[in-house]
């Protein structure tokens, strides 16, 4: 019988998507095959303290904060020097805990922007999902679009602002540029529609800019696209595959954080999408091309708008897509014939394969001294 792999699922974190991260992690833990894996949770609280929860059933039954308070979650630190045992107890005994592969499910800041991936690289650990560079590029939405546009991939147009930029007259200039007064003001590096605000007037624009700068030091302005919100899941390393597309049908004015997570009737999500075969294939091909262009690996969800005349536009790339019970990434693969348990198996295999390939690369170049 093969030895079980020890999988550490990371969740929580110091971002506005902390709670969503926990829900994603719970769904992953509940789905991973306990016959194949030894599962532990690494919980990062709101102030950045790390805890280990080695009883998955406790994590599924209680909130991580509750487990911290009652002592079931052990405080840990990062231990360098032994990749097989990266977590070290802070309880005084110095015990170290194993991990064969890490499944990061920390959404947003410090989890999806390359910071956590950099730490895992330093620990020499296999981990699921995009590497440092790809994570950083995809977290910065304006940088993502710059790269994709340079590669010929159609994207929603945008304008970037920093707090140092003058905003007087910007709204009118953008109205003239795009021919619409309906715009979106959004944080450059946040997800789950946090700090994403629709505006229709210059007064609303000014207020929205001020509000979004409370969350991020750069923002994007985009024309509002009156089209269908389509998503496509991508899976793989060197030869990625695309799922059948899914669709988000918001019942609010737009697909806000509240519509996503707080209002049970905030939106309808479906994997039975009424698109022509040609548009479906176009979406899948663009999703794969975008994935490869920013050098993603493992997984990503590519979000699109499809206009009434069937023009396909990329909106963004999400390198740690949600895995909650309503999340589209696993649902799209389920509709494509890949059930979630098998999807998780493949993601772990892809992570380990990539790590093994990286280990073959020459990292030290020995320069022989030239004899004088």
Swiss-Prot record:
It is found in: Cytoplasm. Mg(2+) 2 binds at residues 316, 318. Keywords: ATP-binding, Cell shape, Cell wall biogenesis/degradation, Cytoplasm, Ligase, Magnesium, Manganese, Metal-binding, Nucleotide-binding, Peptidoglycan synthesis. It is an enzyme of class 6 (ligase). One of its GO terms (cellular component) is cytosol. Mg(2+) 1 binds at residues 303, 316. InterPro entries: ATP-grasp, ATP_grasp_subdomain_1, D-Ala_lig_Van_CS, D_ala_D_ala, Dala_Dala_lig_C, Dala_Dala_lig_N, PreATP-grasp_dom_sf. The keyword 4Fe-4S does not apply. Binds 2 magnesium or manganese ions per subunit. GO terms for biological process: cell wall organization; peptidoglycan biosynthetic process; regulation of cell shape. It catalyses: 2 D-alanine + ATP = D-alanyl-D-alanine + ADP + phosphate + H(+). Its main location: cytoplasm. Its cofactor is Mg(2+); Mn(2+). Belongs to the D-alanine--D-alanine ligase family. NCBIfam families: D_ala_D_alaTIGR, PRK01966.1-4. HAMAP family: Dala_Dala_lig. This is D-alanine--D-alanine ligase. It comes from Coxiella burnetii (strain CbuK_Q154).
């Amino acid at each position: 019988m093969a030895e079980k792999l020890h999988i550490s699922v990371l969740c929580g974190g110091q971002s506005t998507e902390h709670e969503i991260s926990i829900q994603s992690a719970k769904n992953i833990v509940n789905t991973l095959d306990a016959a194949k894996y030894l599962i532990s949770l690494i919980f990062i609280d709101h102030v950045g303290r790390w805890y280990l929860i080695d009883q998955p059933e406790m994590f599924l039954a209680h909130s991580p904060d509750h487990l911290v308070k009652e002592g079931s979650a052990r405080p840990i630190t990062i231990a360098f020097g032994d990749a097989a045992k990266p977590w070290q107890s802070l309880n005084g005994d110095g015990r170290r805990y194993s991990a064969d592969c890490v499944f990061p499910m920390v959404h947003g800041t410090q989890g999806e922007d390359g910071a956590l991936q950099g730490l895992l690289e330093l620990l020499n650990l296999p981990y699921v999902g995009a590497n440092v560079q790809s994570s950083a590029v995809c977290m910065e939405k304006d940088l993502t679009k710059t790269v994709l546009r340079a590669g010929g991939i159609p994207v929603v147009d945008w304008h970037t602002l920093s707090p140092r930029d003058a905003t007087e007259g910007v709204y009118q200039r953008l109205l003239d540029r795009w021919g619409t007064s309906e715009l979106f003001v959004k944080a450059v590096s946040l997800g789950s529609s946090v700090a994403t605000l629709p505006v229709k007037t210059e007064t609303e624009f000014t207020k929205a800019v001020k509000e979004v700068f409370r969350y991020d030091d750069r923002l994007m302005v985009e024309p509002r696209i009156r089209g269908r919100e389509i998503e496509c899941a991508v899976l793989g390393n060197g030869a990625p595959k695309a799922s059948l597309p899914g669709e988000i049908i918001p019942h609010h004015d737009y697909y806000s954080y509240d519509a996503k997570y707080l209002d049970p009737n905030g939106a309808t999500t479906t994997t039975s999408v009424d698109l022509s075969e040609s548009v479906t294939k176009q979406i899948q091909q663009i999703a794969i091309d975008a994935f490869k262009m920013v050098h993603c690996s493992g997984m990503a969800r590519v979000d699109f708008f499809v206009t009434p005349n069937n023009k396909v536009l990329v909106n963004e790339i999400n390198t740690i897509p949600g895995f909650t019970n309503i999340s589209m990434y696993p649902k799209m693969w389920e509709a494509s014939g890949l059930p979630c348990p098998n999807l998780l198996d493949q993601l772990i295999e892809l992570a380990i394969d990539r790590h093994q390939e990286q280990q073959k690369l020459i990292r030290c170049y020995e320069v022989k001294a030239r004899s004088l």
